[in-house]
């Protein structure tokens, strides 16, 4: 599955489409995907000369020059190249790690933001570090991969091969596995406050999240931003619980919300947009 979104130079999304096409590291996949992109452009009547470029966000750490995925265990896309897409498209193309794109969206929406730790609470956990109003990449592009912080050496096996990573406790997939039901069913039942079992699962989730936040803030003294799929489900009570266990007041902020006027998927294009407005 992949999403296509068209945005302007202000970061506003005009059209978006979701297409069911499972990833496969084959020429046929890249051709089908780029054909869908061309069709999207044609159906929305975008003149070629008005299209400044195409940005591709993927689960996977990219090389420093953003030309190749150097670590992609979730999608099994290690080795995927920007060229796999760009050779089929007559536009400038840009490849980006999806977690870094999410952090860029926070910078775009909050130009006053100097530093932050971003938690991307999606199906798979992600994260990013913002320092000096820039996304910190690290020497090997691994900076901000908080999902692989070990919170329990004897914990569940993570897809990275290690045990007890934060991914195995605080991703949406981990929450569904522990609760035994989809997220969309879990939260309405949780808020009814009639199930001690569900409350226990959620408390365990929040405890692990607060533990990670506290430790990260010992290294990066900056606000915490909660974003991603699970973020809209957090209540004020949940935030206060995190603050109490985090032991640093006024440091947790909600990230981009779906009703904020800018489509969250617009984040994938913002690094490319910046190239044209600077």
Give the ranges of each region predicted by the language model.
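Hydrophobic "anchor" residues
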Residues: 13, 68-69, 135-136
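Adenine-nucleotide phosphate-binding core of ATP-dependent small-molecule kinases
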Residues: 28-47, 168-169, 174-236, 254-262
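Acidic/histidine-enriched, beta-strand-rich ligand/metal-binding domains
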Residues: 234-237, 241-258, 262-278
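Glycine-rich phosphate-binding loop and adjoining helix at the ATP-binding site
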Residues: 16-42, 49-115, 236-247
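Conserved hydrophobic/aromatic positions in well-ordered beta-strands
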Residues: 5-7, 128
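Glycine/GP-enriched mid-protein hinge/lid loop-to-helix segment characteristic of carbohydrate kinases
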Residues: 16-18, 25-26, 83, 90-196
């Amino acid at each position: 599955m992949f999403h296509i979104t068209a945005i302007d130079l202000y970061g506003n999304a005009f059209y978006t489409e979701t297409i069911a096409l499972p990833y496969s590291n084959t020429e046929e996949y890249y051709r089908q995907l780029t054909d869908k992109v061309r069709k999207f452009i044609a159906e929305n009547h975008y003149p070629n000369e008005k299209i400044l470029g195409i940005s591709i966000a993927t689960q996977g750490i990219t090389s420093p020059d953003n030309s190749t995925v150097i670590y992609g265990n979730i999608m099994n896309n290690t080795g995927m190249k920007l060229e796999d897409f760009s050779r089929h498209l007559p536009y400038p193309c840009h490849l980006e790690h999806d977690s870094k794109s999410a952090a860029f969206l926070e910078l775009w929406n909050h130009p006053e933001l100097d530093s932050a730790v971003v938690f991307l609470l999606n199906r798979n956990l992600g994260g990013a570090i913002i320092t000096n109003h820039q996304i910190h990449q690290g020497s090997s592009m691994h900076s901000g991969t908080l999902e692989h912080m070990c919170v329990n050496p004897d914990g569940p096996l993570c897809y990275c091969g290690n045990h007890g990573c934060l991914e195995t406790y605080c991703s949406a997939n981990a929450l569904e596995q522990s609760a035994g039901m989809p997220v969309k069913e879990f939260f309405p039942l949780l808020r009814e406050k009639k199930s001690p079992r569900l409350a226990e699962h959620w408390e365990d989730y929040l405890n692990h999240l607060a533990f990670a936040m506290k430790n990260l803030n010992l290294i990066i003294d900056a606000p915490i931003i909660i974003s991603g799929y699970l973020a809209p489900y957090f209540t004020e009570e949940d935030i206060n619980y995190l603050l109490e266990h985090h032991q640093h007041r006024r440091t947790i902020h909600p990230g981009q919300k779906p009703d904020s006027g800018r489509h969250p998927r617009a984040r994938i294009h913002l690094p490319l947009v910046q190239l044209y407005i600077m």
